[in-house]
């Protein structure tokens, strides 16, 4: 490629997303890179819902001060057993890889002060395997009905939220 008569070439360099994907051991033949999730809650929830249903491995960047919030959201949307790996400070002196499932990662970071650049790798679900937490669904249904929704309206809302037809 030329720009103003000068040949341009691409020089490969470190990429946190790909480094985290490879080091996670999670499926890497097909993946989705989300980058940083939007701050606007409705947009965030839309993407989190997509991640919860996705069969492909998902890569996310997150800031240290927002990591705990994101992990809590992933727990809510994907369930605690979903495989995940949180990589911090890749290719640096204090590189760290934490993961097995969302429950364990949430517990690991619960009381920690988090610093550094963070990349999260989330395993996709198996085809046809929607991860629905029945306890959470019942709690959500109860909360919605206490807020004044009818059983029918609350059920329709939760079905849509969880991708159940």
What kind of feature is each model-predicted range?
Residues 37-40, 60, 130:
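Alpha-helix initiation/capping motif
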Residues 57, 64-164:
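A contiguous loop/helix-start segment that scaffolds small-molecule binding in enzyme catalytic cores
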């Amino acid at each position: 490629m030329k720009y103003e008569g000068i040949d341009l070439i691409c020089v490969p360099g470190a990429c946190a997303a790909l480094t985290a994907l490879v080091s996670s051991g999670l499926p890497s033949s097909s993946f989705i890179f989300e980058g940083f999730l939007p701050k606007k809650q409705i947009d965030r929830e839309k993407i989190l819902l997509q991640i919860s249903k996705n069969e492909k491995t998902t890569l996310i960047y997150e800031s240290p001060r927002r990591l705990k919030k994101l992990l809590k959201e992933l727990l809510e949307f994907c369930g605690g057993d979903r495989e995940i790996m949180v990589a911090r400070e890749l290719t640096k002196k204090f590189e760290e890889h934490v993961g097995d499932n969302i429950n364990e990662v949430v517990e690991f970071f619960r009381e920690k002060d988090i610093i550094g650049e963070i990349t999260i790798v989330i395993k996709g679900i198996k085809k046809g395997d929607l991860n629905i937490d029945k306890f959470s669904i019942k709690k959500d249904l109860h909360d919605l009905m206490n807020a004044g929704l009818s059983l029918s309206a609350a059920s329709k809302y939760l079905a849509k939220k969880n991708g159940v037809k």
